[in-house]
UniProtKB/Swiss-Prot annotation:
Residues 771-1104 are annotated as: Interaction with RAD51, BRCA2 and POLH. It comes from the Eukaryota. WD repeats lie at residues 772-833, 835-879, 880-927, 928-970, 976-1027, 1033-1071, 1073-1104. The keyword Coiled coil applies. Plays a critical role in homologous recombination repair (HRR) through its ability to recruit BRCA2 and RAD51 to DNA breaks. Strongly stimulates the DNA strand-invasion activity of RAD51, stabilizes the nucleoprotein filament against a disruptive BRC3-BRC4 polypeptide and helps RAD51 to overcome the suppressive effect of replication protein A (RPA). Functionally cooperates with RAD51AP1 in promoting of D-loop formation by RAD51. Serves as the molecular scaffold in the formation of the BRCA1-PALB2-BRCA2 complex which is essential for homologous recombination. Residues 59-70, 138-154, 306-338, 664-713 have a biased composition (Polar residues). Residues 39-91, 122-157, 243-272, 304-354, 417-494, 581-730 are annotated as: Disordered. Disulfide bonds: none annotated. Residues 446-462 have a biased composition (Low complexity). The modification Phosphoserine is found at residues 274, 364, 432. This is Partner and localizer of BRCA2.
Length: 1104
């Protein structure tokens, strides 16, 4: 523990650590060398066998000639399975040939006769040719363990079953051949091993050993692997053992019959999906040959349910899959891999669809030899170096190249691009959103598991079959029907959208690596294998473990009633909803009810409404919170990190519905200003949690007073006898649609009281709630002209930067500096005599520079206002002139502007130097539509968003100037003004205002709207509509958005504030002294709200 305390190491200790690290690297090198030697030896052996087996064998030829007539009608007698060796690029094939003995014709049918039951041997002989021409036979693993069986345990390769490995008829064969050619990656050479059921041993079948359990040994070296298949043909049924051995094919008018004196086997084949069932002494061995994939299942005392469209077994121990699968889905078996009835589930390799060439990344348990139990602590490493060594060894099954140095350097925090490229983690399977732009890509279907286009070559794994290794990332399993499994498992639920496109990016539990074109899926590891993890002694590392667990638990915020939110089956239909993993419990909705005591002053209710989505989307689509967003602290109020580009934190969006869908919520004793506990991905937590109570007393307008006092019922409220009143709004009349979140919604309100807030001249309490407005100070307008704009910026004077207020009237712009918390002093003034001032353009990261827009009705000039460093005199610099349609100040001291229309449009970015002069200009690619507004995308660097006159949203790359995407949004958002854009998990969250929106009885008076756009598919949906509270009149006049709060001036002269996290109006600021509000802006230096009146007076409020 000396190393953990930060004690510097001596030179000898450093040398010793270097030697130990070198030793650890050597251990890895040796492990890799052994693995490579084994692969090379096996490759050489297989190559030699392939050359020798390339000569046609006369016995095989005679057998084929004898059974030519049957092979014509029964194409599945020769069973072949291919697997691709990634190391050598060779395609190794295995052929299972059922050799008939004699044929007699009876009534037009061909009959096979064999002398006795022992002819059909359960032994699958591995026939190869030795250098001297003799044949070698490898029998059951109980008698001989061959070298290829031993090496199969440590092999790190993926098995591929070529879909062209069996002879198919008609279109199936042509389709499979074409798909196989598309999916072939490298030229391969074939190694063929003939497996025949020889009739050379007249003894009873050697298949029955021990307690009546048989083993099929595939000759590919994978003797301990089970093989799954896709059942695309007819049903394969297994019946009880009868003293006969029969093979029938009704489709091809063939009948194979064998009746030995002591038979215990029955072979049944139905339709093109042929199978071979061997039943001997109350045990069963089945070989399925379904569309070129060999299925092996060995189990005792079991039967296959014979339904027309399924092939499954009773025993689904390791994946809990449903008992019946769909035609294009698979059944997972748990074959035995020993003779003593251990029945352990093995890892399985599967082909899940020819169109995407799926494969399984095999994960084998780590080797337990050469265990290093010492503890070597290095400065900067959280755990001993041996921990990372053993972790890397366990990861070696998923990585093609081990880089111990990369693992250690990554934990030390050293970022090296070349090391990052080498490390490819394949533990989690992630469905990339890149496939959403393909109109013919297969969608995950909960009913059939096949693509909506219906093509046989486009099939995907159904959600009932998705499983991942257990771990902190969660599981994706589906319990069998009729049984409800509750616990820590999570369910992955999917549904389809229109034409195979997703609105929301998929969760991190599934992934398609498009560059490789393969879909990988992890299965549960063998339960019989014990994985020995590196254990840290508790006596030495107990405190470190506790700190690590504590830091991890703080990141996972769980709602107190998360047990009420749980697993629900998705609705049937064509709705796009890819929901994240959710907890297994039932959601019952909202039953709480709060009451308003009589005698309280009128307070308008919240107006959170869910606008129906676009024409292609259903209103049942629910937006969940991105995983990377910030979470509130324990006090329930938003932390300062919420006022950051990480936006938005949204729970389930309540929709407009009837009273039957949800209970009406009222307020109790006060005005609750609710804060949202943002649900993590996969949690269907409440939209509003830990709501806090605060009330406001009616008071006469007078500055420098607290606008709101909060307290419990019965406690004296703070006297607020002056100042413009800011009315916080209660959470009232939340309604939900029945179809929201598949018919269930969860909303919990928890009441907490807050301490009484202080007045303006006292420090505020720490537990202040959102929705409070506190008047700080007031600026009196000395000029007679009306105020047109106000802003806050940093101004540097005498080497010190201080926040200043900039006020703009029609003919003068003034800069105010603070004298104290309540008084301001005018420092600089710029006068304009020719062209009036229209607005102030704040530019972030720029000091001692003010940008203003001049013009009568349209912007004609952009000027920079600054002061000379010598005499401190004011001066003006013309930056741009012309028909300016839009402009915006960007980070890194940049200003973007758009001039002209259509073909003559020019979009230019101007960069300012430290002294305020323009030093660089850049042109952006103009769209074919006139740009009206700009918005910088928070959360994504170098991204700019703009809105056009024809209701489109365009995105630029600021670094290259390229126009990335143009997306048309719904026509219901006509003449929308973009106020902010945020990016999370590949989605765009855009806040727009609708000045021309009409008031409706259903939606009220809409002011702000939150749109979610998928740039990949150009689909958009409105998820949040901020409307005026009930009883408030007017329409949107002017507004501003900062982080998660939005403020707007209404035509009635009132200022309303919405919290986008809560989704409802939190405060109202009525007119003061019969002077209506004319403008409102959020301060860029702090959380102050700047409100201006028509007479030019500016009021500064603190919002918390």
């Amino acid at each position: 523990m000396e190393e953990l305390s930060g004690k510097p190491l001596s030179y000898a200790e450093k040398e010793k650590l270097k030697e130990k690290l070198a030793f650890l690297k050597k251990e890895y090198s040796r492990t890799l060398a052994r693995l490579q030697r084994a692969k090379r030896a096996e490759k050489a052996k297989n190559s030699k066998k392939a050359i020798e087996d390339g000569v046609p064998q006369p016995e095989a030829s005679s057998q084929l000639s004898h059974s030519e007539s049957i092979n014509k009608g029964f194409p599945c007698d020769t069973l072949q399975s291919n697997h691709l060796d990634e190391e050598t690029g060779e395609n190794i094939s295995q052929i299972l040939d059922v050799e008939p003995q004699s044929f007699n014709c009876k009534q037009g049918k061909e009959v096979l006769h064999t002398p006795r039951a022992g002819d059909i041997q359960g032994q699958l002989l591995h026939s190869t040719s030795s250098p001297d021409g003799k044949k070698e036979q490898n029998t059951l693993p109980g008698t001989t363990k061959t070298p290829w069986e031993k090496s199969s345990v440590s092999q790190e390769k993926e098995d591929y079953f070529d879909t062209n490995s069996l002879a198919l008829l008609g279109k199936h064969r042509k389709g499979q051949e074409s798909i196989s050619r598309k999916n072939s990656r490298t030229p391969v050479s074939e190694k063929t091993h003939l497996l025949s059921l020889r009739s050379q041993i007249p003894d009873p079948p050697a298949l029955v050993t021990g307690i009546g359990e048989g083993i099929l040994i595939p000759p590919s070296g994978k003797s301990e692997r089970g093989i799954d298949t896709l059942v695309r043909g007819n049903t394969v049924s297994a019946e009880a053992a009868v003293p006969s051995c029969t093979a029938s094919n009704s489709n091809h008018s063939q009948h194979l019959e064998h009746t030995p004196p002591k038979s215990g086997c029955k072979i049944t084949t139905q339709g093109p999906a042929s199978s071979t069932n061997l039943v001997a002494q109350d045990q069963k061995m089945t070989i399925f040959t379904v569309n070129s994939v060999v299925y092996k299942a060995v189990r005792a005392h079991g039967q296959l349910p014979g339904s027309p469209n399924s092939c499954s077994v009773n025993d689904l121990t390791h994946s809990n899959l449903p008992a019946n699968s769909t035609p294009n889905s698979k059944s997972l078996k748990s074959p035995s891999n020993t003779v003593d009835e251990r029945n352990e589930p093995l890892q399985e390799d599967e082909i899940l669809g020819p169109s995407k060439n799926f494969n399984l990344a095999a994960v084998s348990p780590p080797s337990t030899e050469s265990q290093i139990h010492s503890c070597t602590m290095l400065e900067g490493l959280l755990f001993p170096a041996e921990y990372y060594v053993r972790t890397t060894r366990r990861m070696s099954d998923c990585q093609r190249k081990i880089a111990l140095e990369a693992v250690i350097q990554s934990h030390l925090g050293v970022k090296k691009k070349e090391l990052k490229k080498k490390t490819k983690a394949t533990k989690a399977v992630v469905l990339s959103s890149e496939d959403t732009d393909q109109s013919e890509s297969g969608m995950l279907d909960t009913s059939t598991g096949q693509s909506s286009s219906g093509s046989l070559s486009q099939k995907l794994l159904s959600p009932a079959e998705v499983s991942s290794p257990p771990g902190p990332a969660g599981k994706a399993t589906t319990p069998p029907p009729g049984r409800g499994h509750r616990g820590k498992r999570k369910s992955a639920r999917t549904s389809t959208l229109g034409h195979c496109q997703l609105l929301f990016p998929p969760c991190a539990a599934l992934a398609v690596n498009r560059s490789k074109g393969k879909f990988t899926k992890h299965k549960c590891q063998n339960r019989g294998v014990v994985i020995h993890d590196f254990e840290l002694p508790d006596e030495d590392f107990g405190l470190l473990k506790l700190e690590k667990l504590k830091s991890c638990s703080e990141k996972l915020i769980e709602s107190p009633d998360s047990k009420n939110c749980g697993e629900r089956l998705p609705r049937e239909g064509n709705h796009a909803a890819l929901e994240e993993l959710q907890r297994d419990s039932e959601t019952e909705g909202l039953e709480e009810e709060l009451t308003v005591p009589p005698g309280e002053a009128y307070r308008p209710g919240p107006t959170l409404r869910r606008q129906p989505g676009s024409k292609d989307l259903s209103s049942s689509i629910v937006l969940f919170t991105p995983a990377d967003t910030a979470a509130p602290n324990d006090s329930g109020r938003p932390p300062p990190s919420l006022c950051s580009p990480a936006f938005p934190i949204l729970g389930m969006t309540p929709a407009l519905g009837s009273q039957a869908a949800g209970e009406t919520l009222s307020t109790e004793a006060a005005q609750p200003c609710s804060t949202s506990q943002p649900p993590l991905l996969g949690d269907t937590n409440s939209l509003v949690n830990n709501s806090k109570q605060c009330n406001s007393s009616a008071c006469s307008p007078k500055p420098d007073t607290n606008l709101q006092a909060s307290g419990r019922q019965g406690q004296p409220a703070c006297d607020s006898d002056s100042g413009p009143q800011a009315t916080p709004l209660p959470v009232e009349s939340f309604t939900f649609r029945e179809n929201q979140l598949c018919g269930n919604a969860c909303l919990e309100l928890h009441e907490h009281s807050t301490e009484q807030t202080e007045t303006a001249d006292r420090p505020a309490c720490d537990n202040l709630n959102p929705g409070n407005l506190q008047l700080v100070s007031e600026l009196k307008n000395p000029s007679s002209s009306c105020s047109v704009d106000v802003s806050a910026m940093w101004w540097e004077r005498a080497g010190a930067k201080e926040p200043c207020i900039v006020t703009a009237c029609e003919d003068v712009v003034s800069l105010w500096k603070p004298l104290n918390s309540l008084q301001w002093e005018k420092v600089h003034t710029w006068h304009f005599t020719e062209v009036p001032v229209l607005q102030i353009v704040p530019v972030p990261d720029v000091y001692n520079l003010i940008c203003v827009a001049l013009g009568s009705l349209e912007i004609r000039e952009i000027r920079a206002l600054l002061c000379s460093s010598g005499d401190d005199s004011e001066k003006q610099v013309l930056l741009k002139s012309g028909d300016i349609k839009a402009m915006l100040g960007l980070t890194k001291r940049r200003l973007v502007s758009s001039t002209g229309t259509f073909c003559n449009q020019q979009i230019q970015i101007m960069t300012f130097a430290d002294d305020g002069s323009s030093k660089d200009e850049q042109l952006l690619m103009p769209p074919d539509e006139t740009v009206l507004t700009f918005a910088e995308v928070q959360g994504t660097q170098e991204a700019l968003l703009g809105t056009t006159t024809v209701n489109s949203i365009v995105i630029w790359n600021l670094k290259t100037g390229q126009l990335l995407k143009k997306m048309h949004i719904d026509d219901s958002y006509q003449a929308s003004v973009c106020h902010g854009a945020y990016s999370e998990k590949g989605l765009l969250f855009v806040v727009v205002s609708q000045p021309c929106a009409k008031e409706s009885q259903a939606l009220g008076s809409p002011v702000f709207q939150l749109l979610v756009i998928n740039p990949k598919t150009a689909q958009s949906v409105g998820v949040l509509l901020c409307s005026l509270p009930q009883g408030q009149a007017g329409r949107f006049l002017e507004g501003d958005v900062k982080d998660h709060v939005a403020a707007a001036v209404l035509t009635s002269g009132t200022i309303a504030i919405w919290d986008l996290l809560l989704g409802h109006c939190t405060a109202l600021l009525p007119p003061v002294s019969d002077q209506s509000w004319s403008l409102v802006k959020w301060s860029g230096t702090d959380s102050h709200l700047l409100a201006g009146q028509k007479d030019g007076n500016i009021f500064i409020y603190r919002y918390f």
